[in-house]
Amino acid sequence: MANNEQKRDEGYIEKLVQVNRVAKTVKGGRIFTFTALTVVGDGKGRVGFGRGKSREVPAAIQKAMEAARRNMIQVDLNGTTLQYATKAAHGASKIYMQPASEGTGVIAGGAMRAILEVAGVHNVLAKCYGSTNPVNVVHATFKGLKAMQSPESIAAKRGKSVEEIS
């Protein structure tokens, strides 16, 4: 599993999470294609993931990066950590993330670490249960981050102050 990182001129941090070779068997033999899973973020709460498929690895990575830039979400962060502890699942992958105090660092494995780093989360405790398939872990992590809302946004939706809802 590769974990390459690149900073682009648009200010996005790009990470390659996984490259997978798949084979289609035909009458004349096997046809190999590659799939790439990438995550892109600005380090300030915007993050996206994408998958790309092609006959060559660089083309698959390029398609995945473009898909990730199109599929970006805004995550409400509390400084350099999460707002509150959250759970999410996708397929057989289950994830748990909780905020951590300053200086803790990103304690997460594999695909979750890549997403949290490009999103700009510097202090978090995270655990993946069940299947550790990177594609499902990325989906589950995104579900958890997408569902997270700051107290300010909840208060604004309800037309109340933050003190009234806490």
Curated annotation (Swiss-Prot):
NCBIfam families in UniProt: rpsE_bact
Record's GO cellular component terms: small ribosomal subunit
Domain notes: The N-terminal domain interacts with the head of the 30S subunit; the C-terminal domain interacts with the body and contacts protein S4. The interaction surface between S4 and S5 is involved in control of translational fidelity.
All copies of domain S5 DRBM, residue ranges: 12-75
Molecular-function GO terms, alphabetical: rRNA binding; structural constituent of ribosome
Quaternary assembly: Part of the 30S ribosomal subunit. Contacts proteins S4 and S8.
Gene behind this protein: rpsE
One Pfam family cited in the UniProt record for this chain: Ribosomal_S5
Protein name listed in UniProt: Small ribosomal subunit protein uS5
Functional summary from the UniProt entry: With S4 and S12 plays an important role in translational accuracy.
Keyword RNA-binding: yes
Family note: Belongs to the universal ribosomal protein uS5 family.
GO biological process: translation
